[in-house]
Amino acid sequence: AGTPVTIEAPYLFEDSGINKIGDTYYYTYCSNWNTSGNSYGMTSGAIEYMTASNPLGPYTYGGELFPNQGKFFGLYGNNHHSICAVNGQLYLFYHNRSVEKAMGIEGNYRSPQVDQITMTGTKINTVTGTMKGIAQQKSVNPYVKNPAEMMSDQAGINVRGLGDTVVTEIDKGDWIKVSGVDFSKGASQIVLTASSKSGCAVKICTGSPTGKAVGYAEIPAGGKLSEVSAAVQGLTGNQDLYFVFSGQAEMDCWIAK
């Protein structure tokens, strides 16, 4: 084992880590809440970064990567982050309080978000937090089993469990949306694995929850997960797929055939 090295990070609070981008090492961390009057131009509760040519340093302060999320979304709080590279593009994963804001509550509840990181040379440009996020990275393959909780949008539902989870707390009018589904091979049926205590119809449509129905599935009463099939037509090309429920249900997965 090597000798531990202290990184002298100005106004360090928490949430730190090291990433290598190109030939440069980046130490990123959250600043504390007492940064007033500092000589670096940093703000409180923000993600800062330092650079070095060696993972053990010495590190030099580089700038502010991401201000506190309250600057963009209105509710301030601790700032936690991760930097990930996907398909050669860097992304900042962070949390914000947008869901609780929409619910009209203040419990410091955190919801994950992601925005793109851009760079100028070795400088990380300050990331702007948005409610738009990033573009879908690839189309969804409908010809394999897709977990119901893999969705881009939803209304009214919840997800239960860890690992092998299930979409639950579905009631009349609730829906889930799967964006960018590649139906280039077409489809004649969609098979759902779902359950309902009293029976439930599922409208499968495209474009919007009130869009044109391409098929219907009937989930039998009884409360036991089982496969139910919906004959579908008109599914070609890239589609946003909606499952709209007429009543109480749970849904585990779906596949097109």
Segments and roles (model prediction):
Residues 1-257:
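Carbohydrate-active catalytic/glycan-binding domains of CAZyme proteins
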